[in-house]
Amino acid sequence: MSLMNLPEESRPREKLLALGPKSLTDAELLAIFLRTGIQGMNAIELADKLLKEFGSLRKLLSSDENEFCSHKGLGAAKFAQLQAVVEMTERYLFEKIEKEDALTSPEHTKRYLTRMLRDRHREAFYVLFLDNQHRVLKGEILFEGTIDAAAVYPREVVKRSIDYNAAAIILAHNHPSGVAEPSQADRRITKRISDAVELVDIRVLDHFVIGDGEIVSFAERGWI
C-alpha cells in the first residue's frame, strides 16, 4: 500500500510533525530518509526490510559504501545523502562540546566521542585539545591501527598539542571488540603520554575507552 493511502496519522512525516521525532519507530525514521519505496514495497516496508538485513539502524548508518549499495533500494546517491546526515550529526555534537567546558559537560563529551569512535572496525586513537579554560580547540584522530591495536607515539601527541597551543588534552580510543575495559597496555600508554606532555606544561585530563554501549573514564576510576 502506498504511504499516501495510509491514514494521515500513520504517515511518518505527518506523525513526526504532529508528535515529534521520538514518537517514530526506527523504520518510520528510515522511511523519511528513503522517501520512496521500491516496486511492491512502500518506504516503511522497505525500511523495515533493510533494518532486518543490516541488523540494526546503527549498523546501517555505519556501513561502508559497498555494503550499503549492495542492498536493493539503496545506491550511491542515498549513500552520499546518508554521509551528509552523519557528518552534520558529528559537527553538531562537536559544536556542543566546543562551546562548553569539556569538564563541566562530560555527557556531551562522552556522546561526541562515542559517536566518533564506537562503530569503527579498527582501533583509533583520538585527542581533544583544550585551551586553559578547558574549551575545545580541536579534535583529531592521531593514530589508527588494526582490529585490536593502534600504535600510539607520545611525541606526536606532544607535537600536535603544541601546534594547537593546547593547555590540556583528553584522550580517547575505541575497542572494536566492544569490551570497554581498559587493558594494561592502555594504562601504560596513558602514563607515557601524561609524562611526555607534562614536560611542556600540558595536562591529560582524562582518557576514555569506548566499547559497544559502554565508556570507561580513567579519571572516574582515579587513574589520572
Swiss-Prot record:
Residues binding Zn(2+): 173, 175, 186
A molecular function GO annotation: metallopeptidase activity
CDD domains, alphabetized: MPN_DUF2466
Positions of short motif JAMM motif: 173-186
Biological processes per GO annotation: proteolysis
Keyword Protease (UniProt): yes
Keywords: Hydrolase, Metal-binding, Metalloprotease, Protease, Zinc
Presence of the UniProt keyword Protease in the record: yes
Ranges of residues in domain MPN: 102-224
A Pfam family hit: UPF0758_N
SUPFAM superfamilies assigned: JAB1/MPN domain, RuvA domain 2-like
Family: Belongs to the UPF0758 family.
PANTHER family: DNA REPAIR PROTEIN RADC, UPF0758 PROTEIN YEES-RELATED
Name assigned to this protein: UPF0758 protein VFMJ11_0123
The species this protein was found in: Aliivibrio fischeri (strain MJ11)
